[in-house]
Each structure stands twice: as structure tokens, then as C-alpha cells.
Amino acid sequence: MQAKAVARTVRIAPRKARLVIDLIRGKEVGEAVAILRHTPKAASPIIEKVLKSAVANAEHNYDMDVNKLVITEAYVDEGPTLKRFRPRAMGRASAINKRTSHITIVVSEKKEG
């Protein structure tokens, strides 16, 4: 059985979020939370929140044991891009892309043995 949590349209660039999500993929939940707490990246608290949501979903919806949970899937997809303009010299303007992310974490109970 798998439990899933998704954070959609989070205001962080997918490239930056993937750096953090790669650290926790395949880890046990307790170890993953410890890694996220000690990772000095802006994506860390956001991903930790999604992970806690996935754990809560597993516990509440599927009656899974929290101590046996493992992150089976963790990925970041690109969300809609917010397009902004920055004024430049001589009346010009240049485009600024504010990228967003869809963060997905799937947890399941690890097999015995």
C-alpha cells in the first residue's frame, strides 16, 4: 500500500528543489527528516512539509506503521511559470521567469526481511 502527498505550484525553481529531493529518495522517513533539517536550502522546509503530509496520509488513511515507512518515490515536476519584467537601461525591459514546482512524495511500508 502506498500513501502520497503532492504540493502543487510551489514558488521554487524545480532545478533547485530536485537537488534536495535527490537526497531523500529511497530513505526511511526518520532519516529523511533528519537530512532535510540539516540541509541549508530554501526547498528543505517545503519538502519536509510534503513528507510530513505523506506520513500523515499513510497513518490516517491506510493505518500504516509510521516507523516502517520508506520513501519509494520522490520527484519534482515543473509547474506554471510566472512571467515578470525587469526595467533596464534606456527604456528597455527584460523578461524574468519565476518558476514553480509540483512536488510529489510517495511512501510505503518497507518489506520484512
UniProtKB/Swiss-Prot annotation:
Query: CDD domains given for it?
Result: Ribosomal_L22 (cd00336)
Q: Which Pfam families match?
A: Ribosomal_L22
**The organism sits in which domain of life?**
Bacteria
Q: Could you give one GO CC term from the UniProt record?
A: cytosolic large ribosomal subunit
Which regions form coiled coils?
Answer: none
What PROSITE patterns does the database record attribute to this sequence? RIBOSOMAL_L22
Provide any one GO MF term from the record.
structural constituent of ribosome
Name a biological process GO annotation.
Answer: translation
Question: What SUPFAM superfamilies does its record include?
Answer: Ribosomal protein L22 (SSF54843)
Q: Which UniProt keywords apply?
A: Ribonucleoprotein, Ribosomal protein, RNA-binding, rRNA-binding
Quote the subunit structure annotation.
Part of the 50S ribosomal subunit.
Known role:
This protein binds specifically to 23S rRNA; its binding is stimulated by other ribosomal proteins, e.g. L4, L17, and L20. It is important during the early stages of 50S assembly. It makes multiple contacts with different domains of the 23S rRNA in the assembled 50S subunit and ribosome.
The family assignment reads: Belongs to the universal ribosomal protein uL22 family.
Q: Which protein is depicted?
A: Large ribosomal subunit protein uL22
Q: Native species of this protein?
A: Geobacillus sp. (strain WCH70)
The organism that produces this protein has a lineage beginning with: Bacteria, Bacillati, Bacillota, Bacilli, Bacillales
